[in-house]
Amino acid sequence: MKFPKATYMYWQKRFDRPNPDQEIEEKMLEMRKEHKDYGCLRLKKELENQGIHVNKKKIQRLIKKLGIEVKSYTRKSRRYNSYRGKVGTVAKNRIHRRFYTNICHQKITTDTTEFKYYEVDTTGVVRQKKLYLDPFMDFYNSEILSYRISEKPNALAIMEGLEEAIQMTNDCPFRRTFHSDQGWAYQMNAYKNKLKQHKIFQSMSRKGNCLDNSPMENFFGLLKQEIFHGEVYRSLDELKTKIDQYTYYYNHKRIKKKLNWRSPVQFREAVKQLSNS
């Protein structure tokens, strides 16, 4: 096929011209490696944090050009339910979905979620096993303050996580509230007495109402979308390592719009620095 000389020269100049977006494209490719669920807006804000200002339409065009659209795999699965009936005292719902607070370490929430993995036993048979995660989150900035990982629902793991969360929030100048669902572990005398010992209010969601603890449910959803759904884990250690890595990433690097495009730790430290200046 023959082209007019003018057409040939036009495209030759286009191909020879340096790519004006090369730096931006390289930055975006680097970001996609670390932030697998970042869409257009978060990529734009990350670029701005590095001093690169680009409009939204250009970001969308470059995402399509580079083939880095978000492709996280999601799947609905049965939610783990720790409710075993009334095995102790059920606390009243003090939070009432009032999750917002401008006071660090004042409102804390917790819950348990379940993961599945596979291991080959001594006879060579592949067995499905379970792992349980018990985190404590600060409503102030959605930071995960403490967490424990165990192979079965475990009162000791929850009490250890509770103790660590209490110690980390001792600097709060106001009386604290620790929220949860009505799971068996949170009705235990040991759990309730530990809160009373530190003069902490206990709050519980209404029975079977996961929206009463939606910030924690959102964290579980993000965690499973990023590292669990669509993946197969062959050992406890492999899955545990992934959870450890993601929790650090979530706390220190994953920016949130409600935190002025900072990560939970970045937001907390920025506010602290501002109040000390």
Task: Name each model feature, range by range.
Residues 192, 196, 200, 222-277:
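C-terminal domain-tail junction helix/linker
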